[in-house]
Amino acid sequence: MVSFLTLTSFFFICFFIHGSSAVDTISGDFTLSGDQTIVSSDGTYEMGFFKPGSSSNFYIGMWYKQLSQTILWVANRDKAVSDKNSSVFKISNGNLILLDGNYQTPVWSTGLNSTSSVSALEAVLQDDGNLVLRTGGSSLSANVLWQSFDHPGDTWLPGVKIRLDKRTGKSQRLTSWKSLEDPSPGLFSLELDESTAYKILWNGSNEYWSSGPWNPQSRIFDSVPEMRLNYIYNFSFFSNTTDSYFTYSIYNQLNVSRFVMDVSGQIKQFTWLEGNKAWNLFWSQPRQQCQVYRYCGSFGICSDKSEPFCRCPQGFRPMSQKDWDLKDYSAGCVRKTELQCSRGDINQFFRLPNMKLADNSEVLTRTSLSICASACQGDCSCKAYAYDEGSSKCLVWSKDVLNLQQLEDENSEGNIFYLRLAASDVPNVGASGKSNNKGLIFGAVLGSLGVIVLVLLVVILILRYRRRKRMRGEKGDGTLSAFSYRELQNATKNFSDKLGGGGFGSVFKGALPDSSDIAVKRLEGISQGEKQFRTEVVTIGTIQHVNLVRLRGFCSEGSKKLLVYDYMPNGSLDSHLFLNQVEEKIVLGWKLRFQIALGTARGLAYLHDECRDCIIHCDIKPENILLDSQFCPKVADFGLAKLVGRDFSRVLTTMRGTRGYLAPEWISGVAITAKADVYSYGMMLFELVSGRRNTEQSENEKVRFFPSWAATILTKDGDIRSLVDPRLEGDAVDIEEVTRACKVACWCIQDEESHRPAMSQVVQILEGVLEVNPPPFPRSIQALVVSDEDVVFFTESSSSSSHNSSQNHKHSSSSSSSKKMTNDNSSA
C-alpha cells in the first residue's frame, strides 16, 4: 500500500512539474487548449486563448507576459471560437491549425502545402515575438516554413517588415481591429506604396495620411520631420529590385515599445512606463482625430475638443449604440424619423453653425442663400445644403453626409450647415418656459402681433415682387417659375401659334410681358402627360448647360400640365437636314454641322457624367436637337429620360425611343446604360454627315442604309468624300473632321455597349484631343451592306411632327470583337 501511494505521488509530482513549466514550443505531442499557453524563452511574450473585453468569443493571440494584457497578434481574426476548452491549437497535416470543438471544425490554418510529417515540425514563440513554424532541430539548422511576422495584425513590433512586393505590387498591411472587443479586420490600414511612402487608407481605398517618401540622406520620411528627434528607435529602409520594406529596432532593449494601427484610424506609437505601469502615447498620425476619413460614419459629427469625438446631430441616433460604446463609430447615425417627401411642410432644415463642411457634396450655381435653400427644399433627394459666401457656391448633399466636423468657436473658417429633418425632430426653440409676469406676457403678445403684421406685409410685397419678376422672365438664377394656367394662356394668346406636336402634346409659341419669347408644351393624356411632366421637371428642372434646353417654369393645375422653355427660333435639327424641294431653308454648312455634333456631344456628356444622377435621355434623334438663334444645339424633350443613381451602372426599363436610333440592348430587353444614348448619337451623327435619313433612298434610287455604307468605306479605306452631303459641294469641307466624325459614329453603333465610347470620349475625339483608331464593322449592320437587292425599312417615331421615312432596322445580338478605340489606351 505504501509503495502504491509512493508511486502515485511520484507520477503526480512529475505531471505537476511538466504542466506548470513554461514551454515555448508546440510540437506533435504538445497542443494548446483551455488555459494552456506557450511563453518565449526569455519570458517576454506569451501565447494562448484570450477573450477581448466583455466579449464571449475566444481567440488565439499573443501578448506581453509581464505587462497588463496587451494583445499584439491574433491568429483567427476573422473567425472566433465559442469554447476554449474544447478548441485545440496544434500541428496537423504539415500546418499549424485551430480546431473548434472536438477536433472537428478547422477555424484557422497556416495554409501550407507541406509534405513534412507532424513529428518533424514545431511551432516556436521566439524572443522577438515571432511565431515560427519550422522543421525540427536547432534554430540554426531549422527550415522556417511560416512566420507570424509575415502576417502582421494591427501591431508593428521591432523587427517586423511591412514590405511591398514590387513583382506583384501587393503590400503587407497593418489593419486595425473592428472595435475594442472585436479583433476582426477593421476599416483602417497602413501600407507601403511604390513611392516609398507609408499611407493610411480607409477601406483599402481612400488615403487620408501619408508619411511622404523615404529620404535616404536624412533617413526620415519627408512628411515626418519629428523622426530627426527620435532617441528610442533605429529606423531602417531597404529596397531592391524585388521588394521594399521599412523596419526598426530599439536602441535600449530595456525599453518596451510598439506601433499600433488603432481602431481610431490613427497610427500610434506607445512606450511602456514602468514607474506608472501604463502605456504612454509617444506619437500619432493624423494628429487630429477628426482628420481620420469617415471616422464618425454617415451623418456623424466629429469634434476634436469633445469626448467622445463623435456625436449624432439633432434628429439622429447611433446606428448601433453597442458599437459606439466600443468606440466603433463606422456605422454612423440614422434618422429617428424617416423623411416624407410627399408633403414639404413635414420636413424642415436644422441649422448647424460653424461646421467644416462634409465631403461628397455637389455644387449648384446659385446666387444667394435663399435660392440655394429653395433648390434643396424643392428636391426630395436633397438631404442637406450649405452656402459658401466666399465663393458664392451652393453645396448640396443628395447622399449620406460624410466627414462633418464641428469647429471651435474661435475658428472663423466654419460654415452654416442645414440638415433636412422631419419636422417632429426639429426642436421648438421658442417654447423655453413660462413667465408669471403678466406685463411681460402682454408685451410679448403685442410684440408678436406687431412682428406678425410686419412679416405679413413683407411676404405680400415679396410675393408681388416675385410675381412681377416671374412675368418679366427674370429667372437667370436657374430656379423654376410656377406659372398659372391663365398666365400661360395669355402669354400664348390662347394657344394660337402652334409650333408642332407629338405623342405627348403640342408646343406653342408665346411671349412674356418683357417680350421674351417662350415655347410652351401642353401635355395631353392623363397618365402619359403626368409621367412626362414629372420626368422633365425632375431631370432638367435643376440643371443648366449651354447645350441643354432650359426649362424656365411649369404649370400644374389639376389635369393641366404645361412646361415652359426658352424659345428656339431655328427649330429642330431635322428641319434643316432633311429638306424637301419645296422648303426654302439654308443648307447647314459643314463647319456648322460639326459644331452641332460637338455641342450635342457635350450636352450628353454633361447628362451622363456631371449631374448628381446619371441622366439617360433615351430618345436622341435630330427632332430632339433644337437650334437657337446662333444655331447652338440644345438637347431637348426629356419626357422619356431615366435617372440612374451613381451607385448603379444600369437601369431596367420598358422599351422607349425611336426605331432607327435604338441600341440593340433595347430590343433584347436587358438593362440599359448611358451607352444606349451613345448608340443613338452615332446614328444621328451619320445623318449629320450625309444630310439625309439613314434609310433614305440615294439619288440613284437604290436603297442604302447609310451606316453600313459608311462602315464599308471606313473599313476598306474608301473615298470619305463620297459620304458627305452632296449639297455641300463647293463648301469648305474639312475631310479630316469628316473622317473623325464617321469613325466615332461607327464606334458609337457597335453591338456590344462595352465597345462604345463614353460621351466624354466622343467630345475629346471631336475636339481632336484623342486620336481615334479605325473601328470594326458592326455585325448587326453587316447584313445591310449595299447590294443589288432591295431592302425594305420601316420607321416609327415618337414625334408626329417629324419627317418620317420607312425603315425596319433589324438588330442582331451577335457581338463584335473588343478593340481599342483611341490611341491613349482608353478603351471604348
Swiss-Prot record:
Glycan attachment points: N85, N113, N203, N234, N240, N255
Extracellular side: 23-439
InterPro entries registered for this protein in UniProt: Bulb-type_lectin_dom, Bulb-type_lectin_dom_sf, Kinase-like_dom_sf, Pan_app, Prot_kinase_dom, Protein_kinase_ATP_BS, S_locus_glycoprot_dom, Ser/Thr_kinase_AS
Source organism, top-level taxon: Eukaryota
UniProt region (CaM-binding), positions on chain: 582-600
Modified residue annotations for Phosphothreonine: T653
Location in the cell: Cell membrane
Protein name: G-type lectin S-receptor-like serine/threonine-protein kinase At2g19130
